[in-house]
Amino acid sequence: MPGARSEAGGVDNPLVLDSSDSDDNLSGLPLNGRVKRIDGNDRSYKKKSLTSMRKSTVVDLTLSDSDEAVESVNLLPGSSSTPDRAAQAGISDKQPSLRRRPRPFMSIADSSSPPENQNVISFLGNHSQEIGELPSPPLVEDRAAPNKMELGGENIAGQNNEANAAQAAVPVSGTPSLTLSSNRPQSVSGAQLVVASSSRSAINSPPRRTPSIPQQSPSSRATPCRSASIASSRSRPPTPPLPATQSTPVTVSRRLASPILSPVQAVSSAIISPTIPSIPSHASLSDPTILSPPSATSAPPNSPIPSTSTTVQTPAAALTYARPSTSAAPLPVMPISVTPATTSPAGPGPSALQSASEATKSSDQKESPRKTNSKQPSSPSSTHGRWTDTRLFHTPSNLSATSGKSSAASSRSKSRAPLSSRAAMSDNVAGPSKTTSVSSTHPPSRASPSSLPSQSQRQVHPRPPSRDGVGKREKKSKTLSSGTGQSTPSKFSLPTSDVASNQKNKSTGLNALPKKPSSTPTSSIPQRTSTLATAMAIRPFVRSPTPPSPQSSSEASRSIQTSRGAVKAAQNQDKIHPLSTALSISSHSREATTKATTLFHTTSSPPSPSQSTSAPTKSHVVWNAQKLGTTVLSSERIHLSRGKSQTSDSVVAPAASQTAASLSYPAGTSGGAREADKKAVETSFHAGPSSADFEAFVQPSTSAIAPTTVRPSVAPPEDAPVLKSGSIIHPLFRAASAIGDQNAFTKTEAVGDVLSQGSKGRASSPRITTTGAVSHLAPHVDLGSKIKPTAAPSLFASGVTTKNVDDQDSAQPQNQTPLPSAISVSSKKNHGSLSKESSIKSAASFISSSSTLGDSVSGLGRKSHHKSTQSMPQSPLPTTNTNNSSGIEVNSWLNPQPFGPSFAASHLSIHAKKKWKERERGKEREKEKVREKEKAEEENEQLRQRRIADLEKLSANLELYKRRMDVESRTRSIPRADGETRKRPPSPGISVSTDAEVRVVKRSKPTWAIAPEGGHVAPAMEKESANVNKKAADAIKINHQPASSYAPAFATPASPAKATRTPLSVTAGLGPPVNSSSSTSTPSLLSRSINLGILRDKPKDHMDDDDGDDSAGGLPVRKTGKNGAVEEQVEQVRLDLDDVSIHGSSPAAPLSIFTSRFRDVSITPSRIQKTLEESDNDVPIQRYAVKVNGKQKAQRSKDKSYGSESENDVPLNWPSRKGKGRTAPEPQDSSETQRDDDDVNLGSGDGEERPSDDDSIPVPPAPLFKDRTAHVRQPLQTLFKGGIVAKHSYQRPLAKASAVSPVPSANRPSPAPSAKADLLPQKRKRRLKKITSQQWQHIAQNSLSDVDDLLGESSKKRLSPENAEKLGADLSKLTRPRVFSIVSRSEPRTKREPIEEDNNEYFTDSDSHTSDVALFSQHPDPPPPPERIREAKRNFDTRNIDPWNRQKHTFRSNPALHRAIFEAYIMQSTSMEESGGDDIKVTNDVDADGGPPDFEFVYSDTMLYPDGIPPPELGLGCDCDGPCDPDSETCTCVKRQELYFYDLGLKGFAYDENGKIRENSASIWECNELCGCPPECMNRVIQRGRARDTGIEIFKTKEKGWGIRARSFIPSGTYIGSYTGELIREAESERRGVTYTAIGRTYVFDLDGWQIRHPPKGLEKIDKRAAELAEAVKMRARAAMRESQEDAYNAYSVDAFHYGNFTRYFNHSCDPNLAITQAYVKDFHPERPLLVIFTRRDIKKHEELCISYKGIPDDDDIPSPEPVKKKKGGKGKKQMSKTSASAHPPEMTALNSDKGLVEVKDICRCGAKNCDGRMFNYGP
């Protein structure tokens, strides 16, 4: 009935739902879940109404093994029909799906998750089966339900009860389902339900800064919401109406109604608490041991309803297990009983429970509102689920449990209800060492009305909050009454649960706890238990129970009455299971006779680190006998499992005939100021066979339950909630906590599963004391599950009680008498034989099989990631020291020598031995390095000696050759083998014979020939002529030839001309030359090739007429009537034929140094191939003589033995003289050729006779080149920065020199003939030929040489302006250089395989570095797994910066606007990358215009991978389900990080619990997207970005340009940012460094971390892929360092010139306050770390943030795993840390068009004490 009010004047049952989906026209909803038909009969909805539930956080509290679970819809009475009511309630056949933000954590229950994830749903569901609707506690993060948790159970409900069974599901998150109008509260049976829901977590998201604002519902403006028991206090303001909130999903099964949870707003001290209707009288009782309530009676019309009372109605026949709609396996739950004693101070009359019970009989009955007597003295009212102290403790209702600000639970959403402004207090105490206790009460004793303080007394004496953070223990026993703060002396000591104040405990992070009136022993049980027993024991105590008012034992005993007949009737039902978890709430009449009651309580507190792990735990059982109350305090020692939990595949299921015990605790207080208060009314919560339908009740057996204590076998995992931003409760206890209100639950911090703050920021385990009769629940275990069950701990019986574990006292268990356990099948027979000193002791094998619930039942369902702390070691401790005179147990932490007397000595000995072995290994490594160095020096010396010997032989051969070819000055004749002397050719006037003589050269294949223009290449003859002198076979024989003009000619087909065979000494392996510089990207790739293909200017000068009729040079000469003897050309050709390595396949084949002497060279593959096929070994060669300088030079050979192939013939392997001769021509086509079939022809000169036009073409057509292969094989090559140097067979260069670079023919001037032909290199000072400006520009553009190479070896790496002028270099016209193949100055000793560029797809022509290609080819990376490869950002987008640059001129006149636009540009660029950081401001107080920096770069916080760079690769992820534990032994990320700590002695992650870096000299390995941990993991600091409180700004300095400074105080170790930019190779960084040197700025940082070349040992055990990469990188680093002779290696660099973020503005300081380290976040390749920046020390406000371009400055402060020997002298680099990153140093010289090369201004202006005046480190 909308708007109906009870007689008490309050809204009876305002079902608060989400206003978004509510319907104002809906009628009330009964709590029992039944739908009332018009005829009065009960009717239940079938399954199809809510069969499909959305994947949301829903807890289904129903259990059943039946496949056909019947679901009922909780509809409101008053509807005409069931479908209509369903429509009014907003229920559809398919549950609507509300789009909800996904959660990275688990969700407590998921209606669409697999069955193994539904056990928590089933586990929690039983709490609300008979309550109907329960309030929700403050929420934590939704987490995934435990996996593989499947427990067996039976359908214990009889068929007779199925018709009346009503089971409910309690949702805990806001999703749409049943909706009602929260603005119009509904009246249902006179019961009020106040619940709270949440749609957001309190853990994973930071709390909002605006607290929730209480709202009022328009339907309840006149009368505040009240309960049904006692009138509200006059001092409390009226309770506000319930606001409209989001709806919550309801999953129903069987015939139960769906309880609705929704938030409640509370104002001031008014506390809204649920009132639960009483139990119908027709409920049946199934077990005699279950506490059952008496029949309910009608409530009088004038009974007052206090705002803090609680009444609960139990649905009828809620005894059946109903399988949830998600097919979750049933989970047996510990039977519990909650007994809040609540009385009305208004005199005799029916209680609120009876009124509520009567109200349920007719759901549409209206009750007239009752007026509250404001003059009536306030009596102790009951706040369900919360304790209150005798003194008021006023605190803001919405304060967090730790910070005093708005709690996360209340500030997450507007729909969450704020906490009550009045914080209830308790006298329980939390010890000084992280203790949080929750205790229940003994049976309340009789309290006289006179002992209660008046209202004024309660207002005058408030209790101030505790300032020391921890409440103190009171020795004096007290009993507290809920809601009034009154206390009366009681017969029994009444322990109460702790209620935290708003004062934060400094040591634990918890709130201060009030004093405890009783020193009841508590136990130490780790939080988040791993056994079913512990989980069951915690369950009823999630919400702090309300203590009863003091009352006598007789009154307490009258609170529960049972009927033996009803019990017997219930036992006759076959299918009633003893483990039924129906939660029944009994209401008792005043006339009921006094029976017995059993009360239990739980204490939750973390253990003291100094106490033994086997400290005995306590359990407290309060037995109220018929006339006498007896307190049973038992103790037992629980030994934690110190290793991994043992698993067991056997499961012992409980017998169906077992009798389930009932655990009960008071849920309310009783007491009053009148005589009528003596008849207290108590309400019991209990689990087991329902007794709600029985009117008669049976007294339960006092021995039904044996007190016991259980402890988990494993430590709590890391993902357990920690009190950081408010009260945090594990999701397992959300629905179960509905027995208390929002305030009470929030203030009880450590109930059940709340963690206290540990010493290192990790959660400590609270102590949990439970009671017996819980270990008998042996659920079904899925043997196929991956998560194996955990064995239960050993249990011992003991009658000795101990003190709190925080008191540092522990006692040995005495009288360890094994007692019958509820686990045993025969335990039901022993219920009556249990004494108060008895306890449970279970056999190890039996417990391991029956307690295999482990983490499954406790809500974890996953393996533990929490390593035990010092108080709970994982491994078993040695027990050698058995004789302990101090009486302390061996394993106790109080034992000074727990490992025996000799353990310390042996341990130290082992430690010293280990250190000694490490030192020895270090010495061996040093010796090995020395040996390697000596070996390298010895090999180098051998190479040098061999080089000297080769040079000596070469010099001797050259001298011999010069003597042979010495030309007589007068006769100009050449001696022949037959002794004749050839005369000079006749004068041009003499007629010339048309028959030319052809000289045949004896060669080995392949050969090439040069024939006269009109002649043809004659086929080689197999035998020589008879006239050949065998002794002079190596000499040159030249026949008489007619006079001719001597000019080069093509190799043409041989003609039948007269030929003379002349064997010629050739070097083995000669062959045709190969074009090596035809490629624009690699012009000098071949070491033994000739630059070919460019036409030369044909010589126009002719020889003078001179006497002589002989040819010159021993080659065929065509006499044309002119003096055509050209010794120079003849000798040049001879040398080319003898010593030039053109095609040699032998490794000893050298490079010709006379490549520049070729005049006209072309490649004719097809023609030469045809010639070679037709020819044999002998190929005729003919060449025309050419006139040089108008003179002829004759040469003669004085040694006829020249040309013989002997051992003295050494290849000519000296470098070419720079500037001498002409530069090698460059081919006009850009394609490269293959060496195997190419050949060389010498072009024709200006001879008058040309046989054909085809022969006169010096260069073949272009198609000959286009079909050639694009790559040239290059074995045994040596390439230097300046060009090509010949290489010997031992792979060492002779000297560093530059080859003459090719110059395009268009830019080459006409060659001037030399006055003197220096055919051979002389041992004299080299003369440099002046290079033109075009030649210099061509060299610079093609990176063929550098300044040092052009000057030769005597330049000493410096080029003076005079030398630059001599070279004629025009340095002002330098353009952007191009990347070519250049290697370092020294060559590795090992031979390399031929390099193919196609082997590595990431090396392109524009970024090809011979050293990189060689290294990556020789030591390639193994292929990456596809699942680890991620997409790289290849291109940067300029769409953001281009509009700013286009509009820059418009806002330069307004500096403020200009700066604002720059700030907006940064914010726009990083909106999707670093959204959590504070905005970056720009300040300019130096410049007159005050503008920001130029928009010259693209702003981004992501690394850019240009084309040619491999994509990022992720590392192996961990399998942690929650935040990673730094002490975990299974987390892969922790193990990998510890390896990279090397010898720093650090454990865990690189960060502490506050996100601060612990050591900035070690590399950081964060978790990645392959890990299972959430974003809140402590190992994801860089991924979360810069914190919002870390404010920075870009400001203009006076001398250093732009810089960065702090806007606020920044502590040490804070993450500032990442140095992002373009990831480029080392070759590219070298090339860009030239440009940056010219402009005076550099933004290049080298990735040269120490860890790159020193991978840790044992990495292959953690990540095999990472170990393979590290090994390949290590080999490349060694090879590169051996080549460059440097101490550092970096394959990549980061350039932030065109692409980066604010870190590019950091200036240099020799004493920086920032440290750059290398981290692996999104790319785990060892060579590609991310440069991250942290603070080295505390930074003040407005202090400039600086880094060091040299790396970390002080070597002594940096620990290194190996001793580092510093180099002598000050030019070497300092040893960097393991991750030190230094800026790429610019070139020492800068280019200047006027002054040549000048010094770079490398001046440091930091002003530090250790400043050396330089900003960069330069190598040797």
From Swiss-Prot:
TM stretches of this protein: none
Pfam families: Pre-SET, SET
EC number of this enzyme: 2.1.1.-, 2.1.1.367
Residues that hold Zn(2+) 3 according to the record: C1524, C1567, C1573, C1577
Biased composition (Basic and acidic residues): 361-370, 917-944, 966-983
Domain Post-SET residues, every copy: 1800-1816
Region (Disordered): 1-54, 74-251, 284-618, 634-681, 804-836, 850-893, 911-944, 966-996, 1063-1126, 1183-1270, 1296-1335, 1385-1407, 1756-1794
Localisation: Nucleus; Chromosome
Occurrences of domain SET (ranges): 1590-1750
Domain Pre-SET: 1516-1585
Family annotation (SUPFAM superfamilies): SET domain
Compositionally biased residues, Low complexity: 11-31, 152-169, 226-236, 284-311, 339-352, 400-424, 443-459, 514-531, 551-563, 594-618, 850-861, 1076-1089, 1296-1320
Free-text disruption phenotype from the record: Severely decreases localization of DMT5 to DNA. Decreases methylation of the fifth carbon of cytosine (5mC) in DNA; simultaneous disruption of UHF1 exacerbates the effect.
Single GO MF annotation: histone H3K9me2 methyltransferase activity
Basic residues bias: start-end ranges: 1765-1776
Amino-acid positions noted as binding Zn(2+) 2 in the UniProt annotation, renumbered to this chain: C1518, C1533, C1567, C1571
Residues that, per the record, bind Zn(2+) 1: C1518, C1520, C1524, C1531
Alphabetically ordered keywords of this record: Chromosome, Metal-binding, Methyltransferase, Nucleus, S-adenosyl-L-methionine, Transferase, Zinc
Catalytic activity from the UniProt record: N(6)-methyl-L-lysyl(9)-[histone H3] + S-adenosyl-L-methionine = N(6),N(6)-dimethyl-L-lysyl(9)-[histone H3] + S-adenosyl-L-homocysteine + H(+); L-lysyl(9)-[histone H3] + S-adenosyl-L-methionine = N(6)-methyl-L-lysyl(9)-[histone H3] + S-adenosyl-L-homocysteine + H(+)
Binding sites annotated in the UniProt record for S-adenosyl-L-methionine: K1600, G1601, W1602, Y1643, R1704, N1707, H1708
Domain of life (superkingdom): Eukaryota
Residue stretches of biased makeup (Polar residues): 109-129, 174-204, 212-222, 374-385, 433-442, 479-510, 643-662, 810-827, 869-893
Function summary: Histone methyltransferase that specifically dimethylates histone H3 to form H3K9me2. H3K9me2 represents a specific tag for epigenetic transcriptional repression by recruiting HP1 proteins to methylated histones. Mainly functions in heterochromatin regions, thereby playing a central role in the establishment of constitutive heterochromatin at centromeric regions.
Similarity section: Belongs to the class V-like SAM-binding methyltransferase superfamily. Histone-lysine methyltransferase family. Suvar3-9 subfamily.
Name recorded for this polypeptide: Histone-lysine N-methyltransferase, H3 lysine-9 specific
Species in which this protein is naturally found: Cryptococcus neoformans var. grubii serotype A (strain H99 / ATCC 208821 / CBS 10515 / FGSC 9487) (Filobasidiella neoformans var. grubii)
